[in-house]
Protein backbone atom coordinates (compact mmCIF):
# COMPACT_ATOMS: atom_id res chain seq x y z
CA UNK A 1 0.00 0.00 0.00
CA UNK A 2 1.07 3.60 -0.60
CA UNK A 3 2.42 5.57 2.36
CA UNK A 4 -0.12 7.70 4.19
CA UNK A 5 0.29 11.37 3.29
CA UNK A 6 -0.53 14.23 5.65
CA UNK A 7 -3.59 15.39 3.64
CA UNK A 8 -4.99 11.85 3.56
CA UNK A 9 -4.43 11.44 7.31
CA UNK A 10 -6.04 14.77 8.16
CA UNK A 11 -9.04 14.03 5.95
CA UNK A 12 -9.50 10.70 7.70
CA UNK A 13 -9.18 12.28 11.15
CA UNK A 14 -11.84 14.83 10.24
CA UNK A 15 -14.22 12.21 8.87
CA UNK A 16 -15.16 10.62 12.21
CA UNK A 17 -17.54 11.77 14.92
CA UNK A 18 -14.99 12.37 17.67
CA UNK A 19 -17.22 14.89 19.42
CA UNK A 20 -15.12 17.86 18.43
CA UNK A 21 -11.95 18.88 16.58
CA UNK A 22 -9.05 16.43 16.92
CA UNK A 23 -5.27 16.58 16.64
CA UNK A 24 -2.97 13.92 15.15
CA UNK A 25 0.80 14.27 15.07
CA UNK A 26 1.23 11.81 12.19
CA UNK A 27 3.42 9.30 14.02
CA UNK A 28 2.57 5.62 13.87
CA UNK A 29 1.29 4.25 17.16
CA UNK A 30 1.88 0.82 18.71
CA UNK A 31 3.70 -2.33 17.66
CA UNK A 32 1.46 -3.51 14.81
CA UNK A 33 2.88 -4.05 11.32
CA UNK A 34 -0.23 -4.66 9.21
CA UNK A 35 -2.56 -1.68 9.57
CA UNK A 36 -1.43 1.96 9.81
CA UNK A 37 -2.34 3.07 13.33
CA UNK A 38 -2.40 6.61 14.72
CA UNK A 39 -3.29 8.16 18.07
CA UNK A 40 -5.61 11.17 17.82
CA UNK A 41 -7.02 13.33 20.58
CA UNK A 42 -9.55 16.09 21.00
CA UNK A 43 -8.08 19.55 20.76
CA UNK A 44 -9.08 20.17 24.38
CA UNK A 45 -7.23 16.96 25.42
CA UNK A 46 -10.40 15.53 26.99
CA UNK A 47 -10.37 12.21 25.13
CA UNK A 48 -8.12 10.04 22.94
CA UNK A 49 -8.91 7.72 20.04
CA UNK A 50 -7.28 5.18 17.75
CA UNK A 51 -7.42 5.88 13.99
CA UNK A 52 -6.43 3.11 11.57
CA UNK A 53 -6.05 2.65 7.85
CA UNK A 54 -7.01 -0.95 7.12
CA UNK A 55 -4.43 -2.86 5.09
CA UNK A 56 -6.48 -4.05 2.13
CA UNK A 57 -3.55 -6.05 0.77
CA UNK A 58 -4.10 -8.35 3.75
CA UNK A 59 -7.81 -7.78 4.34
CA UNK A 60 -9.33 -7.61 0.88
CA UNK A 61 -12.92 -7.16 2.10
CA UNK A 62 -12.86 -4.23 4.55
CA UNK A 63 -16.64 -3.92 4.39
CA UNK A 64 -17.12 -7.51 5.55
CA UNK A 65 -14.37 -7.06 8.12
CA UNK A 66 -16.11 -4.06 9.66
CA UNK A 67 -19.47 -5.86 9.59
CA UNK A 68 -17.83 -8.61 11.65
CA UNK A 69 -16.31 -6.18 14.12
CA UNK A 70 -19.48 -4.13 14.54
CA UNK A 71 -21.64 -7.21 15.04
CA UNK A 72 -19.28 -8.81 17.54
CA UNK A 73 -18.64 -5.62 19.54
CA UNK A 74 -22.36 -4.84 19.78
CA UNK A 75 -22.95 -8.37 21.08
CA UNK A 76 -20.09 -8.06 23.57
CA UNK A 77 -21.34 -4.67 24.77
CA UNK A 78 -24.78 -6.11 25.52
CA UNK A 79 -23.25 -9.04 27.41
CA UNK A 80 -20.89 -6.83 29.41
CA UNK A 81 -23.70 -4.46 30.34
CA UNK A 82 -25.94 -7.36 31.42
CA UNK A 83 -23.10 -8.65 33.61
CA UNK A 84 -22.76 -5.27 35.31
CA UNK A 85 -19.55 -4.35 33.53
CA UNK A 86 -18.40 -1.27 31.65
CA UNK A 87 -18.71 -1.81 27.88
CA UNK A 88 -16.91 1.48 27.30
CA UNK A 89 -13.80 -0.07 28.81
CA UNK A 90 -14.19 -3.83 28.46
CA UNK A 91 -14.85 -3.90 24.73
CA UNK A 92 -13.60 -2.11 21.64
CA UNK A 93 -16.00 0.68 20.70
CA UNK A 94 -16.24 1.65 17.05
CA UNK A 95 -16.51 5.40 16.40
CA UNK A 96 -18.87 6.16 13.48
CA UNK A 97 -18.09 8.64 10.74
CA UNK A 98 -19.91 11.97 10.64
CA UNK A 99 -22.37 10.33 8.23
CA UNK A 100 -22.96 7.42 10.62
CA UNK A 101 -20.93 4.76 8.78
CA UNK A 102 -18.58 2.31 10.49
CA UNK A 103 -15.68 3.19 8.19
CA UNK A 104 -14.45 5.96 5.90
CA UNK A 105 -13.13 5.60 2.34
CA UNK A 106 -10.47 8.16 1.47
CA UNK A 107 -9.75 9.76 -1.92
CA UNK A 108 -7.37 6.92 -2.78
CA UNK A 109 -9.98 4.26 -2.05
CA UNK A 110 -8.50 3.14 1.28
CA UNK A 111 -10.69 2.19 4.25
CA UNK A 112 -10.27 3.80 7.68
CA UNK A 113 -11.88 3.11 11.06
CA UNK A 114 -11.67 4.56 14.55
CA UNK A 115 -12.03 3.29 18.12
CA UNK A 116 -12.18 4.81 21.56
CA UNK A 117 -8.75 4.63 23.20
CA UNK A 118 -8.89 2.39 26.28
CA UNK A 119 -7.09 4.47 28.89
CA UNK A 120 -4.86 3.24 31.72
CA UNK A 121 -4.12 -0.12 30.15
CA UNK A 122 -1.02 -1.95 28.97
CA UNK A 123 -0.42 -4.83 26.59
CA UNK A 124 2.44 -7.21 27.28
CA UNK A 125 4.86 -8.17 24.52
CA UNK A 126 5.95 -11.36 26.28
CA UNK A 127 4.99 -13.47 29.28
CA UNK A 128 6.50 -11.76 32.30
CA UNK A 129 5.09 -14.02 35.01
CA UNK A 130 2.62 -16.85 35.48
CA UNK A 131 -0.03 -14.52 36.90
CA UNK A 132 -0.03 -12.40 33.74
CA UNK A 133 -0.31 -15.47 31.51
CA UNK A 134 -3.25 -16.74 33.52
CA UNK A 135 -4.91 -13.32 33.33
CA UNK A 136 -4.54 -13.32 29.55
CA UNK A 137 -6.03 -16.82 29.48
CA UNK A 138 -9.00 -15.81 31.63
CA UNK A 139 -9.66 -12.77 29.44
CA UNK A 140 -9.55 -14.80 26.22
CA UNK A 141 -11.75 -17.48 27.77
CA UNK A 142 -14.27 -14.83 28.82
CA UNK A 143 -14.23 -13.45 25.27
CA UNK A 144 -15.10 -16.90 23.92
CA UNK A 145 -17.77 -17.44 26.57
CA UNK A 146 -19.46 -14.10 25.86
CA UNK A 147 -19.61 -14.97 22.16
CA UNK A 148 -20.79 -18.56 22.65
CA UNK A 149 -24.31 -17.69 21.49
CA UNK A 150 -23.25 -15.48 18.58
CA UNK A 151 -24.11 -17.06 15.19
CA UNK A 152 -20.59 -17.82 13.97
CA UNK A 153 -21.74 -18.84 10.49
CA UNK A 154 -22.92 -15.26 9.82
CA UNK A 155 -19.38 -13.88 10.03
CA UNK A 156 -17.31 -13.11 6.95
CA UNK A 157 -14.05 -14.98 6.42
CA UNK A 158 -11.62 -12.05 6.49
CA UNK A 159 -8.63 -14.19 5.48
CA UNK A 160 -9.69 -17.22 3.48
CA UNK A 161 -8.82 -20.63 4.96
CA UNK A 162 -6.60 -18.99 7.57
CA UNK A 163 -6.39 -21.97 9.93
CA UNK A 164 -7.15 -24.65 7.35
CA UNK A 165 -4.15 -26.81 8.24
CA UNK A 166 -4.69 -29.37 5.43
CA UNK A 167 -4.68 -26.49 2.94
CA UNK A 168 -1.48 -25.13 4.47
CA UNK A 169 0.02 -28.59 3.99
CA UNK A 170 -1.13 -28.66 0.35
CA UNK A 171 0.45 -25.25 -0.26
CA UNK A 172 3.70 -26.55 1.22
CA UNK A 173 3.71 -29.51 -1.17
CA UNK A 174 3.11 -27.16 -4.12
CA UNK A 175 6.00 -24.95 -3.05
CA UNK A 176 8.18 -28.00 -2.60
CA UNK A 177 7.34 -29.33 -6.07
CA UNK A 178 8.11 -25.95 -7.64
CA UNK A 179 11.30 -25.47 -5.58
CA UNK A 180 11.68 -22.01 -7.10
CA UNK A 181 15.05 -21.27 -5.48
CA UNK A 182 16.48 -24.78 -5.27
CA UNK A 183 16.25 -24.82 -1.49
CA UNK A 184 14.51 -28.18 -1.09
CA UNK A 185 17.78 -30.11 -1.05
CA UNK A 186 18.85 -28.28 2.12
CA UNK A 187 15.77 -29.11 4.19
CA UNK A 188 15.31 -32.88 3.92
CA UNK A 189 14.78 -33.35 7.71
CA UNK A 190 12.11 -30.64 7.81
CA UNK A 191 10.33 -32.09 4.77
CA UNK A 192 10.27 -35.52 6.41
CA UNK A 193 9.01 -34.01 9.66
CA UNK A 194 6.03 -32.36 7.99
CA UNK A 195 5.15 -35.34 5.81
CA UNK A 196 5.17 -37.66 8.82
CA UNK A 197 2.38 -35.51 10.28
CA UNK A 198 0.17 -35.07 7.23
CA UNK A 199 -2.69 -37.03 8.83
CA UNK A 200 -2.42 -34.92 11.98
CA UNK A 201 -3.19 -31.83 9.91
CA UNK A 202 -6.75 -33.11 9.37
CA UNK A 203 -7.66 -33.93 12.98
CA UNK A 204 -9.48 -30.75 14.01
CA UNK A 205 -11.37 -30.17 10.77
CA UNK A 206 -12.37 -33.84 10.70
CA UNK A 207 -13.77 -33.46 14.23
CA UNK A 208 -15.71 -30.38 13.11
CA UNK A 209 -17.08 -32.16 10.03
CA UNK A 210 -18.17 -35.10 12.20
CA UNK A 211 -20.05 -32.77 14.55
CA UNK A 212 -17.80 -33.67 17.47
CA UNK A 213 -16.75 -30.07 18.17
CA UNK A 214 -18.68 -26.84 17.48
CA UNK A 215 -18.03 -23.97 15.13
CA UNK A 216 -17.43 -20.84 17.19
CA UNK A 217 -16.61 -17.18 16.90
CA UNK A 218 -12.85 -17.13 17.27
CA UNK A 219 -10.26 -14.35 17.40
CA UNK A 220 -7.60 -16.25 15.43
CA UNK A 221 -4.65 -14.10 16.53
CA UNK A 222 -4.44 -14.64 20.28
CA UNK A 223 -0.97 -13.34 20.97
CA UNK A 224 -0.47 -12.05 24.49
CA UNK A 225 -0.26 -8.45 23.22
CA UNK A 226 -3.83 -8.58 21.94
CA UNK A 227 -5.16 -8.48 25.50
CA UNK A 228 -5.25 -5.20 27.41
CA UNK A 229 -4.51 -5.32 31.15
CA UNK A 230 -5.32 -2.66 33.73
CA UNK A 231 -2.20 -0.58 34.27
CA UNK A 232 -2.67 -0.40 38.05
CA UNK A 233 -4.18 -3.77 39.00
CA UNK A 234 -3.05 -6.10 36.18
CA UNK A 235 -6.65 -7.22 35.70
CA UNK A 236 -7.67 -8.32 32.20
CA UNK A 237 -9.72 -5.58 30.55
CA UNK A 238 -10.46 -6.42 26.92
CA UNK A 239 -9.41 -8.26 23.78
CA UNK A 240 -8.25 -6.09 20.88
CA UNK A 241 -7.24 -6.47 17.21
CA UNK A 242 -10.48 -8.04 15.99
CA UNK A 243 -9.63 -8.07 12.27
CA UNK A 244 -9.35 -11.85 12.19
CA UNK A 245 -12.54 -12.56 14.14
CA UNK A 246 -14.12 -15.29 12.02
CA UNK A 247 -15.85 -18.65 12.29
CA UNK A 248 -13.37 -21.10 13.79
CA UNK A 249 -12.59 -23.51 16.60
CA UNK A 250 -11.78 -22.85 20.24
CA UNK A 251 -8.67 -24.97 19.67
CA UNK A 252 -7.34 -22.30 17.31
CA UNK A 253 -7.36 -19.52 19.89
CA UNK A 254 -6.17 -21.72 22.72
CA UNK A 255 -3.47 -23.26 20.56
CA UNK A 256 -2.05 -20.03 19.20
CA UNK A 257 -1.72 -18.62 22.70
CA UNK A 258 0.16 -21.73 23.78
CA UNK A 259 2.37 -21.58 20.69
CA UNK A 260 3.44 -18.03 21.46
CA UNK A 261 3.40 -18.06 25.25
CA UNK A 262 4.22 -21.48 26.71
CA UNK A 263 7.91 -21.51 25.86
CA UNK A 264 11.09 -19.72 26.80
CA UNK A 265 12.43 -18.74 23.40
CA UNK A 266 12.07 -16.25 20.59
CA UNK A 267 10.00 -17.38 17.63
CA UNK A 268 13.09 -17.15 15.42
CA UNK A 269 15.63 -18.71 17.83
CA UNK A 270 18.41 -20.19 15.64
CA UNK A 271 19.82 -22.41 18.41
CA UNK A 272 17.34 -25.25 18.85
CA UNK A 273 18.96 -26.30 22.14
CA UNK A 274 17.44 -23.12 23.61
CA UNK A 275 13.88 -23.99 22.57
CA UNK A 276 11.75 -25.48 25.35
CA UNK A 277 8.02 -26.09 25.53
CA UNK A 278 6.90 -25.27 29.08
CA UNK A 279 4.26 -27.75 30.25
CA UNK A 280 3.77 -25.82 33.48
CA UNK A 281 2.91 -22.61 31.61
CA UNK A 282 0.60 -24.67 29.42
CA UNK A 283 -1.22 -25.81 32.56
CA UNK A 284 -1.35 -22.26 33.95
CA UNK A 285 -2.94 -21.01 30.74
CA UNK A 286 -5.30 -23.98 30.42
CA UNK A 287 -6.67 -23.55 33.93
CA UNK A 288 -7.20 -19.83 33.39
CA UNK A 289 -8.87 -20.31 30.02
CA UNK A 290 -11.19 -23.07 31.19
CA UNK A 291 -12.14 -21.12 34.32
CA UNK A 292 -13.97 -18.63 32.10
CA UNK A 293 -14.72 -20.60 28.91
CA UNK A 294 -15.16 -24.12 30.25
CA UNK A 295 -18.84 -23.83 31.18
CA UNK A 296 -19.85 -23.75 27.51
CA UNK A 297 -17.48 -26.53 26.40
CA UNK A 298 -18.13 -30.26 26.39
CA UNK A 299 -15.57 -33.05 26.77
CA UNK A 300 -14.61 -33.47 23.11
CA UNK A 301 -14.04 -29.76 22.68
CA UNK A 302 -11.88 -29.54 25.79
CA UNK A 303 -9.86 -32.50 24.56
CA UNK A 304 -9.37 -30.75 21.20
CA UNK A 305 -7.50 -27.92 22.92
CA UNK A 306 -4.36 -30.04 23.22
CA UNK A 307 -4.59 -30.72 19.49
CA UNK A 308 -4.97 -26.99 18.96
CA UNK A 309 -1.66 -26.33 20.68
CA UNK A 310 0.11 -28.91 18.53
CA UNK A 311 -1.55 -28.07 15.22
CA UNK A 312 -1.32 -24.28 15.47
CA UNK A 313 2.40 -24.72 16.13
CA UNK A 314 2.81 -27.23 13.30
CA UNK A 315 0.76 -25.06 10.93
CA UNK A 316 2.86 -22.00 11.69
CA UNK A 317 6.04 -23.96 11.05
CA UNK A 318 4.63 -25.20 7.74
CA UNK A 319 3.84 -21.61 6.74
CA UNK A 320 7.36 -20.44 7.61
CA UNK A 321 8.93 -23.29 5.61
CA UNK A 322 6.60 -22.71 2.66
CA UNK A 323 7.63 -19.06 2.59
CA UNK A 324 11.28 -20.11 2.76
CA UNK A 325 10.80 -22.35 -0.29
CA UNK A 326 8.98 -19.59 -2.18
CA UNK A 327 11.63 -16.94 -1.54
CA UNK A 328 10.59 -15.26 1.72
CA UNK A 329 7.85 -13.09 0.22
CA UNK A 330 5.23 -13.21 3.00
CA UNK A 331 7.04 -13.04 6.34
CA UNK A 332 9.55 -10.23 6.71
CA UNK A 333 13.09 -11.52 7.14
CA UNK A 334 16.08 -9.81 8.76
CA UNK A 335 18.72 -12.37 7.83
CA UNK A 336 19.35 -15.33 5.50
CA UNK A 337 17.48 -18.49 6.57
CA UNK A 338 15.30 -16.44 8.93
CA UNK A 339 12.14 -18.30 7.95
CA UNK A 340 13.97 -21.61 8.15
CA UNK A 341 15.01 -20.80 11.72
CA UNK A 342 11.41 -19.89 12.52
CA UNK A 343 10.14 -23.16 11.07
CA UNK A 344 12.69 -25.23 12.97
CA UNK A 345 11.71 -23.56 16.24
CA UNK A 346 8.06 -24.45 15.67
CA UNK A 347 8.95 -28.03 14.81
CA UNK A 348 11.09 -28.37 17.94
CA UNK A 349 8.12 -27.22 20.01
CA UNK A 350 5.87 -29.73 18.23
CA UNK A 351 8.27 -32.59 19.03
CA UNK A 352 8.35 -31.58 22.67
CA UNK A 353 4.56 -31.34 22.81
CA UNK A 354 4.30 -34.83 21.35
CA UNK A 355 6.52 -36.13 24.15
CA UNK A 356 3.99 -34.94 26.76
CA UNK A 357 0.80 -35.01 24.70
CA UNK A 358 -1.06 -37.34 27.07
CA UNK A 359 -0.30 -34.97 29.93
CA UNK A 360 -1.44 -32.00 27.84
CA UNK A 361 -4.74 -33.75 27.14
CA UNK A 362 -5.24 -34.71 30.78
CA UNK A 363 -4.70 -31.10 31.86
CA UNK A 364 -7.44 -29.70 29.60
CA UNK A 365 -9.75 -32.67 30.00
CA UNK A 366 -9.14 -34.68 33.18
CA UNK A 367 -12.20 -36.85 32.50
CA UNK A 368 -10.69 -38.18 29.25
CA UNK A 369 -9.90 -41.88 29.12
CA UNK A 370 -6.39 -41.89 27.69
Named regions from a protein language model:
Residues 1-25:
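Juxta-kinase regulatory segment immediately upstream of eukaryotic protein kinase catalytic domains
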Residues 26-28, 33-174, 248-250, 261, ...:
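Conserved ATP-binding subdomain of kinase catalytic cores across diverse folds
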Residues 27-31, 52-53, 59-63, 118-134, ...:
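ATP-dependent phospho-/nucleotidyl transfer catalytic cores
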Residues 251-295, 311-330:
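Active-site activation/catalytic loop segments of kinase-like enzymes and analogous catalytic loops
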Residues 302-312:
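Small/polar glycine-rich anion-binding or flexible loop at a beta-alpha turn
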Residues 353-356:
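Long, compositionally biased intrinsically disordered regions
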